[in-house]
């Protein structure tokens, strides 16, 4: 466990990386593809928004469902649902050109990946020493980033010029199916899962506690706000940036090709892979909240505005865009301790706290595109980017009200040993 993760869980990281490669295949081009089929930018953004809403609900349910029925079982259910619904989306809904069908099937597919990845977070929380959990979460998010961002972004940049955008959507299936099979064959079962002694009423109460804890625990509520904010651009930029950078819609400049944007986005995720591991260890050593407050929030402010203004002032400058991707990637990955913060704020209800974390994470997939859907037609891409940046600045202030029980630190984020020496 030198890397902070038991060997028995390594297969789970591989499964997540492979599965999320399939899930991330579409992120850098689907919004543009939908617009190219004759739909508006708002209709395209709405599809991602509804997808995010379903993902938020699935994320909320995943933590408690994994505790009740076993993390591996819920992972398999989520992956299977994703594969079936993706087949319906690509094979039936998209070719039909019927927008309500496209919207409905794509939104329903949002149930799949949260059940798959966040159930594994429960398995990690059940297995790993809390003092090492942030480091382990660093590896978890590294695997996630490698899949959804690196392979998921870079591979389409090569397949789209060869087979086009529609057939590139089909190429995501082998990866997601492979991730499902790795989970089936190699991921261990939860030791304390599937508690058959719980009544149906108890199960419903435990599930509802994942949301109720947001009302009754102020610390969890504040952490949820930061959790939503920290990934706004992660899910908002794939919706607006292909339109801003590669088309002339709503004031876009068409500076880059979609394949170039895919490479910029993929490079950002290369940075987050290393950032997730680095920040996971830094958070365990120097304090979770301080890191997110000063590096996470403010790097994201700079990186978010840079994505908009660099093309405005310097045109199609790949070097500067990649440099900005480094800043944004380091900012996003600095929030990696969030997975450890939530259970540390509710030690007596870890399952509900993890569900609240997953719910907030899912809400980011909802609010990121929602901001774009509501604002892009009125204040343009620049206004959307400024909205994201202001949210990050607000998030920095909110962190002052969050005081998790981090091992080795007091409630204000100071090392206990340092205080004792004074």
Short names for language-model regions:
Residues 349-377:
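A late C-terminal transmembrane helix in Major Facilitator Superfamily
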Residues 1-6, 190-224, 417-422:
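Juxtamembrane intracellular "pre-TM" segments in multi-pass secondary transporters
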Residues 105-143:
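Cytoplasmic helix-loop-helix junction between adjacent transmembrane helices
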Residues 80-96, 298-314:
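C-terminal ends and interior cores of transmembrane alpha-helices
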Residues 29-42, 239-260:
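Short amphipathic helix-loop junctions that connect adjacent transmembrane helices
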Residues 68-79, 285-298:
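Cytoplasmic membrane-interface "Motif A"-like loop-to-helix N-cap segments
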Residues 52-60, 149, 269-277, 365-366:
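Residue-level signature of mid-helix packing/kink "hotspots" within the transmembrane helices
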Residues 59-70, 276-288:
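Helix-to-loop junctions at the C-terminal end of transmembrane segments
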């Amino acid at each position: 466990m030198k890397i902070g993760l038991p060997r028995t869980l390594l297969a789970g990281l591989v499964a997540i990386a492979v599965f999320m490669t399939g899930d991330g295949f579409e992120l850098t081009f689907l919004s543009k593809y939908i617009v190219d089929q004759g739909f508006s930018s708002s209709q395209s953004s709405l599809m991602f928004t509804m997808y995010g809403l379903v993902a938020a609900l699935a994320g909320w349910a995943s933590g408690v469902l994994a505790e009740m029925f076993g993390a591996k079982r819920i992972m398999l259910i989520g992956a299977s649902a994703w594969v079936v619904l993706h087949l319906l989306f690509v094979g039936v809904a998209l070719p039909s050109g019927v927008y309500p069908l496209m919207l409905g099937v794509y939104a329903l597919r949002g149930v799949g990946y949260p059940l798959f990845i966040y159930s594994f977070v429960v398995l990690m929380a059940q297995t790993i020493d809390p003092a090492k959990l942030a480091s382990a979460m660093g590896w978890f998010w590294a695997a996630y980033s490698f899949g959804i961002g690196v392979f998921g972004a870079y591979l389409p940049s090569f397949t789209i010029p060869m087979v086009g955008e529609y057939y590139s959507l089909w190429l995501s299936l082998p990866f997601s199916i492979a991730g499902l099979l790795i989970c089936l064959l190699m991921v261990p079962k939860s030791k304390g899962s599937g508690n058959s002694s719980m009544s149906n009423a108890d199960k419903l109460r435990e599930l509802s506690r994942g949301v109720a804890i947001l009302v009754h625990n102020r610390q969890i509520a504040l952490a949820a706000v930061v959790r939503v904010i920290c990934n706004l651009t992660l899910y908002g930029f794939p919706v607006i940036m292909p339109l801003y950078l590669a088309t002339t819609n709503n004031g876009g400049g068409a500076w880059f090709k979609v394949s170039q944007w895919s490479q910029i986005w993929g490079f950002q995720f290369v940075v987050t892979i290393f950032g997730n591991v680095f920040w996971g260890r830094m958070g365990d050593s120097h304090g979770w909240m301080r890191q997110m407050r000063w590096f996470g929030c403010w790097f994201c402010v700079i990186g978010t505005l840079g994505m908009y203004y660099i093309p405005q002032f310097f045109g199609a400058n790949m070097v500067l865009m990649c440099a900005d991707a480094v800043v944004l990637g380091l900012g996003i990955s600095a929030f990696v301790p969030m997975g450890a913060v939530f259970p540390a704020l509710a030690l007596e209800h870890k399952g509900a706290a993890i569900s609240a974390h997953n719910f907030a994470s899912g809400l980011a997939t909802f609010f990121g595109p929602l901001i774009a859907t509501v604002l892009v037609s009125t204040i343009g891409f620049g206004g959307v980017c400024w909205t994201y940046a202001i949210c990050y600045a607000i998030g920095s202030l909110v962190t002052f009200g969050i005081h998790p029980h981090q091992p080795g630190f007091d409630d204000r984020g100071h090392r206990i040993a340092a205080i004792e020496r004074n």
